[in-house]
Amino acid sequence: SVGEAIRESGINRKDLFITTKLWNTDHGYDTTMRAFEHSMKLLGLDYLDLYLIHWPNPIKFRDCWQKANAGSWKAFEELYRAGRIRALGVSNFLPHHIDALMETAEIAPMVNQIRLCPGETQDAVVSYCREHHILVEAYSPMGTGKIFKVPQMTALAEKYQRSVAQICIRWSLQMGFLPLPKSVTPARIAENAQVFDFELDEADVAMNASLKGCCGESRDPDQILF
Protein backbone atom coordinates (compact mmCIF):
# COMPACT_ATOMS: atom_id res chain seq x y z
CA SER A 1 0.00 0.00 0.00
CA VAL A 2 0.97 3.65 -0.27
CA GLY A 3 1.10 3.93 3.50
CA GLU A 4 3.41 0.95 3.78
CA ALA A 5 5.71 2.39 1.12
CA ILE A 6 5.85 5.70 2.98
CA ARG A 7 6.76 3.99 6.23
CA GLU A 8 9.46 1.91 4.54
CA SER A 9 10.88 4.99 2.80
CA GLY A 10 11.42 6.92 6.00
CA ILE A 11 9.78 9.99 4.46
CA ASN A 12 7.66 12.01 6.88
CA ARG A 13 4.00 11.67 5.94
CA LYS A 14 3.59 15.40 6.50
CA ASP A 15 6.02 16.06 3.64
CA LEU A 16 3.72 14.36 1.14
CA PHE A 17 0.47 15.59 -0.39
CA ILE A 18 -1.82 12.69 -1.25
CA THR A 19 -5.03 13.03 -3.23
CA THR A 20 -7.66 10.52 -4.25
CA LYS A 21 -11.11 10.77 -5.79
CA LEU A 22 -14.64 9.55 -5.26
CA TRP A 23 -15.56 7.35 -8.21
CA ASN A 24 -18.60 7.97 -10.41
CA THR A 25 -20.72 5.08 -9.13
CA ASP A 26 -20.28 6.00 -5.46
CA HIS A 27 -22.14 9.31 -5.22
CA GLY A 28 -24.54 9.82 -2.31
CA TYR A 29 -23.90 10.08 1.43
CA ASP A 30 -23.73 6.43 2.49
CA THR A 31 -21.86 5.17 -0.56
CA THR A 32 -19.37 8.03 -0.27
CA MET A 33 -18.61 7.08 3.31
CA ARG A 34 -18.10 3.45 2.34
CA ALA A 35 -15.99 4.38 -0.68
CA PHE A 36 -13.79 6.63 1.45
CA GLU A 37 -13.13 3.92 4.02
CA HIS A 38 -12.37 1.46 1.22
CA SER A 39 -9.88 3.87 -0.33
CA MET A 40 -8.20 4.48 3.01
CA LYS A 41 -7.88 0.75 3.60
CA LEU A 42 -6.30 0.25 0.18
CA LEU A 43 -3.97 3.21 0.68
CA GLY A 44 -3.07 2.29 4.25
CA LEU A 45 -3.40 5.89 5.41
CA ASP A 46 -5.01 7.68 8.34
CA TYR A 47 -5.93 10.83 6.42
CA LEU A 48 -5.95 12.36 2.95
CA ASP A 49 -4.61 15.75 2.02
CA LEU A 50 -7.27 16.20 -0.65
CA TYR A 51 -10.43 14.29 -1.59
CA LEU A 52 -12.23 15.10 -4.83
CA ILE A 53 -15.56 14.28 -6.44
CA HIS A 54 -14.23 13.01 -9.76
CA TRP A 55 -17.20 13.79 -12.01
CA PRO A 56 -20.18 16.14 -11.57
CA ASN A 57 -22.81 14.26 -13.53
CA PRO A 58 -22.08 10.53 -13.93
CA ILE A 59 -24.34 8.52 -16.19
CA LYS A 60 -25.59 6.54 -13.17
CA PHE A 61 -26.94 9.72 -11.57
CA ARG A 62 -27.88 11.67 -14.69
CA ASP A 63 -31.45 12.22 -13.45
CA CYS A 64 -30.53 13.11 -9.87
CA TRP A 65 -26.96 14.41 -9.94
CA GLN A 66 -27.70 17.43 -7.76
CA LYS A 67 -29.08 15.27 -4.94
CA ALA A 68 -26.30 12.69 -5.31
CA ASN A 69 -23.60 15.36 -5.20
CA ALA A 70 -25.22 17.00 -2.18
CA GLY A 71 -25.12 13.71 -0.31
CA SER A 72 -21.50 13.13 -1.22
CA TRP A 73 -20.56 16.65 -0.19
CA LYS A 74 -22.24 16.24 3.20
CA ALA A 75 -20.00 13.20 3.72
CA PHE A 76 -16.97 15.20 2.56
CA GLU A 77 -17.74 17.95 5.05
CA GLU A 78 -18.06 15.47 7.92
CA LEU A 79 -14.78 13.80 6.97
CA TYR A 80 -13.13 17.22 6.78
CA ARG A 81 -14.39 18.25 10.21
CA ALA A 82 -13.21 14.93 11.62
CA GLY A 83 -9.70 15.52 10.25
CA ARG A 84 -9.85 12.56 7.88
CA ILE A 85 -9.33 14.87 4.90
CA ARG A 86 -7.39 18.13 5.01
CA ALA A 87 -8.98 19.69 1.93
CA LEU A 88 -12.05 18.91 -0.14
CA GLY A 89 -12.73 19.63 -3.77
CA VAL A 90 -14.21 18.66 -7.09
CA SER A 91 -13.00 17.71 -10.55
CA ASN A 92 -14.41 18.48 -14.00
CA PHE A 93 -17.10 20.68 -12.45
CA LEU A 94 -18.53 23.57 -14.47
CA PRO A 95 -19.95 26.68 -12.78
CA HIS A 96 -23.54 25.41 -12.74
CA HIS A 97 -22.41 22.20 -11.03
CA ILE A 98 -20.74 24.18 -8.25
CA ASP A 99 -23.72 26.53 -7.95
CA ALA A 100 -25.98 23.51 -7.43
CA LEU A 101 -23.59 22.07 -4.85
CA MET A 102 -23.53 25.34 -2.91
CA GLU A 103 -27.31 25.29 -2.47
CA THR A 104 -26.80 22.81 0.39
CA ALA A 105 -23.06 22.97 1.11
CA GLU A 106 -21.71 24.50 4.29
CA ILE A 107 -18.09 24.44 3.08
CA ALA A 108 -17.21 25.58 -0.43
CA PRO A 109 -14.95 23.47 -2.66
CA MET A 110 -11.32 24.39 -2.14
CA VAL A 111 -10.12 22.91 -5.44
CA ASN A 112 -11.49 22.29 -8.91
CA GLN A 113 -9.28 19.96 -10.93
CA ILE A 114 -9.92 20.42 -14.66
CA ARG A 115 -8.18 19.76 -17.97
CA LEU A 116 -5.95 22.72 -18.82
CA CYS A 117 -3.09 22.83 -21.29
CA PRO A 118 -1.84 25.04 -24.14
CA GLY A 119 -4.86 25.80 -26.29
CA GLU A 120 -7.30 24.58 -23.61
CA THR A 121 -7.88 27.37 -21.10
CA GLN A 122 -11.54 26.91 -20.04
CA ASP A 123 -11.80 30.64 -19.40
CA ALA A 124 -15.33 30.66 -17.99
CA VAL A 125 -14.61 27.91 -15.47
CA VAL A 126 -11.30 29.46 -14.42
CA SER A 127 -12.88 32.91 -13.97
CA TYR A 128 -15.66 31.42 -11.86
CA CYS A 129 -13.20 29.56 -9.66
CA ARG A 130 -11.06 32.65 -9.11
CA GLU A 131 -14.12 34.71 -8.26
CA HIS A 132 -15.09 32.11 -5.65
CA HIS A 133 -11.54 31.56 -4.33
CA ILE A 134 -11.32 27.99 -5.61
CA LEU A 135 -7.83 26.76 -6.51
CA VAL A 136 -7.62 25.60 -10.13
CA GLU A 137 -5.61 22.42 -10.60
CA ALA A 138 -4.59 21.57 -14.17
CA TYR A 139 -4.61 17.89 -15.01
CA SER A 140 -3.06 16.84 -18.33
CA PRO A 141 -0.99 20.06 -18.42
CA MET A 142 0.82 18.69 -21.46
CA GLY A 143 -2.40 17.69 -23.16
CA THR A 144 -1.68 14.66 -25.28
CA GLY A 145 1.42 13.43 -27.04
CA LYS A 146 0.48 15.71 -29.91
CA ILE A 147 1.82 18.72 -28.00
CA PHE A 148 5.39 17.55 -28.57
CA LYS A 149 4.94 17.92 -32.33
CA VAL A 150 3.29 21.35 -32.36
CA PRO A 151 5.75 23.66 -34.18
CA GLN A 152 5.09 26.61 -31.89
CA MET A 153 5.89 24.49 -28.84
CA THR A 154 9.10 23.06 -30.24
CA ALA A 155 10.14 26.59 -31.22
CA LEU A 156 9.58 27.80 -27.66
CA ALA A 157 11.53 24.86 -26.27
CA GLU A 158 14.45 25.86 -28.49
CA LYS A 159 14.10 29.55 -27.60
CA TYR A 160 14.23 28.93 -23.85
CA GLN A 161 16.52 25.91 -24.04
CA ARG A 162 13.97 23.79 -22.21
CA SER A 163 11.89 20.73 -22.99
CA VAL A 164 8.38 21.07 -24.38
CA ALA A 165 7.13 19.56 -21.13
CA GLN A 166 8.86 22.28 -19.11
CA ILE A 167 7.37 24.96 -21.36
CA CYS A 168 3.89 23.53 -20.76
CA ILE A 169 4.33 23.38 -17.00
CA ARG A 170 5.84 26.87 -16.82
CA TRP A 171 2.97 28.23 -18.91
CA SER A 172 0.47 26.63 -16.56
CA LEU A 173 2.12 28.23 -13.54
CA GLN A 174 2.17 31.66 -15.17
CA MET A 175 -1.52 31.26 -16.02
CA GLY A 176 -2.15 30.83 -12.30
CA PHE A 177 -2.93 27.12 -12.44
CA LEU A 178 -1.46 24.35 -10.29
CA PRO A 179 -0.19 21.85 -12.90
CA LEU A 180 -0.26 18.11 -12.23
CA PRO A 181 2.22 16.52 -14.63
CA LYS A 182 2.27 12.74 -14.64
CA SER A 183 5.36 10.57 -15.02
CA VAL A 184 6.82 7.37 -13.61
CA THR A 185 10.30 8.08 -15.00
CA PRO A 186 12.64 9.55 -12.33
CA ALA A 187 14.55 11.71 -14.82
CA ARG A 188 11.35 13.20 -16.21
CA ILE A 189 9.92 13.78 -12.74
CA ALA A 190 13.07 15.73 -11.87
CA GLU A 191 12.93 17.64 -15.15
CA ASN A 192 9.28 18.55 -14.61
CA ALA A 193 10.21 20.21 -11.31
CA GLN A 194 12.92 22.37 -12.88
CA VAL A 195 10.62 25.17 -13.97
CA PHE A 196 11.22 27.85 -11.35
CA ASP A 197 14.39 29.40 -12.76
CA PHE A 198 12.93 30.90 -15.93
CA GLU A 199 9.82 32.71 -17.15
CA LEU A 200 8.00 32.85 -20.45
CA ASP A 201 7.53 36.22 -22.11
CA GLU A 202 3.98 37.54 -21.91
CA ALA A 203 3.63 37.20 -25.68
CA ASP A 204 4.62 33.54 -25.47
CA VAL A 205 2.13 32.90 -22.66
CA ALA A 206 -0.61 34.41 -24.82
CA MET A 207 0.50 32.44 -27.87
CA ASN A 208 0.32 29.17 -25.94
CA ALA A 209 -3.18 30.01 -24.78
CA SER A 210 -4.26 30.66 -28.37
CA LEU A 211 -3.31 27.22 -29.73
CA LYS A 212 -6.92 26.11 -29.68
CA GLY A 213 -7.44 22.43 -30.37
CA CYS A 214 -3.76 21.52 -30.58
CA CYS A 215 -4.27 18.87 -27.89
CA GLY A 216 -7.96 18.24 -28.35
CA GLU A 217 -10.68 19.89 -26.30
CA SER A 218 -12.52 19.08 -23.10
CA ARG A 219 -15.92 17.49 -23.55
CA ASP A 220 -19.10 18.54 -21.79
CA PRO A 221 -19.38 16.46 -18.59
CA ASP A 222 -23.18 16.64 -18.85
CA GLN A 223 -23.08 14.84 -22.19
CA ILE A 224 -20.39 12.19 -21.79
CA LEU A 225 -21.68 8.68 -21.05
CA PHE A 226 -19.27 8.20 -18.17
Q: Where does each model-flagged region fall?
A:
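N-terminal binding-site loop/beta-alpha segment at the start of enzyme catalytic domains
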Residues: 1-16, 33, 71, 143, ...
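Acidic (Asp/Glu)-rich catalytic clusters
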Residues: 3-13, 40-46, 101-105, 126-132
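A short, structured active-site edge motif that brings together acidic residues
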Residues: 13-26, 47-56, 116
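Local beta-strand N-terminus motif with an aromatic residue
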Residues: 15, 45-48, 85, 109
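Active-site mouth loops of central-metabolism enzymes
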Residues: 22-30, 60-65
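Short, acidic/polar
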Residues: 28-43, 94-99, 120-121
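CE4/NodB-like, metal-dependent polysaccharide N-deacetylase domain
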Residues: 32-53, 78-82
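Beta/alpha (TIM)-barrel catalytic core signal, keyed to glycine-rich beta->alpha loops juxtaposed to Asp/Glu
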Residues: 55-218, 222-226
